[in-house]
Amino acid sequence: MNMSVLTLQEYEFEKQFNEHEAIQWMQENWKKSFLFSALYAAFIFGGRHLMNKRAKFELRKPLVLWSLSLAVFSIFGAVRTAPYMLYILMTKGLKQSVCDQSFYIGPVSKFWAYAFVLSKAPELGDTIFIILRKQKLIFLHWYHHITVLLYSWYSYKDMVAGGGWFMTMNYGVHAVMYSYYALRAAGFRVSRKFAMFITLSQITQMLVGCVINYLVFSWMQHGQCHSHVQNIIWSSLMYLSYFVLFCHFFFEAYIGKTTKARKVD
């Protein structure tokens, strides 16, 4: 196991965190993510059915608080993990930043790695607001939530290579995305270009994810990266499907609407 630990000032809760207990718990309980996913899917179909004949709920204030909470969490996660990844990348190179496993057990990053994985369960709550407010629920939304939850819990238990990249990227994108959601829910008018930027960031994240998987597979053949073929296959399928779905969403939401508007004019 390659170890490269960046010394950062730790908060007390980061010092007290026991990563060994966390990893053991996930090894014993990761399959519960399937139960959460099943309950989530049941809520989606059951909730939409119940709301068919009911008036929508506004829930503006709860939505602001929800989005703001996730934005703050993601910002802290990005601020605490990005310096680690940047340090490894600049001092040890790309290969070490991908293959290094100390992200899971390092003084600061260990807490945020586990917090990231656990956060994928409460993030399912995003959909509750969509259902109760009777907004359009697209396939990408719930498919993304379910698969990220399953893959995150499945991968954390094995401390697979590439995890530092995956988690840090997601923290960064979510920091911007949930901040945008909070502003919109609070009634602020935000430029359409900002929403386009977020989607482009997500598309870029998926491309980088595919590249990381390729690198892990290549270096794994030489015993330099800790992972296994099954994980890489699932991860690659997941990132490729995200890439296709987010590209389709970008075209439908921004390019397609603009083209239709011009034809009408």
Swiss-Prot record:
Cellular localization per UniProt: Endoplasmic reticulum membrane
Naturally occurring in which organism (per UniProt): Gallus gallus (Chicken)
GO biological process, alphabetically ordered: fatty acid elongation, monounsaturated fatty acid; fatty acid elongation, saturated fatty acid; long-chain fatty acid biosynthetic process; long-chain fatty-acyl-CoA biosynthetic process; unsaturated fatty acid biosynthetic process; very long-chain fatty acid biosynthetic process
Membrane topology: Multi-pass membrane protein
Listed transmembrane segments: 34-51, 70-90, 111-131, 137-156, 159-179, 197-217, 232-252
EC class name: transferase
Keywords on record: Endoplasmic reticulum, Fatty acid biosynthesis, Fatty acid metabolism, Glycoprotein, Lipid biosynthesis, Lipid metabolism, Membrane, Transferase, Transmembrane, Transmembrane helix
EC number: 2.3.1.199
HAMAP family with a match to the protein in the record: VLCF_elongase_6
Pathway in which the depicted protein is active: Lipid metabolism; fatty acid biosynthesis
A GO molecular-function descriptor: fatty acid elongase activity
Activity regulation, short description: The reaction is stimulated by the presence of HSD17B12, the enzyme catalyzing the second step of the elongation cycle.
Entry GO terms, CC: endoplasmic reticulum; endoplasmic reticulum membrane
Protein name: Very long chain fatty acid elongase 6
Reactions listed under catalytic activity: a very-long-chain acyl-CoA + malonyl-CoA + H(+) = a very-long-chain 3-oxoacyl-CoA + CO2 + CoA; hexadecanoyl-CoA + malonyl-CoA + H(+) = 3-oxooctadecanoyl-CoA + CO2 + CoA; (9Z)-hexadecenoyl-CoA + malonyl-CoA + H(+) = 3-oxo-(11Z)-octadecenoyl-CoA + CO2 + CoA; dodecanoyl-CoA + malonyl-CoA + H(+) = 3-oxotetradecanoyl-CoA + CO2 + CoA
Family: Belongs to the ELO family. ELOVL6 subfamily.
Nucleotide-binding keyword on record: no
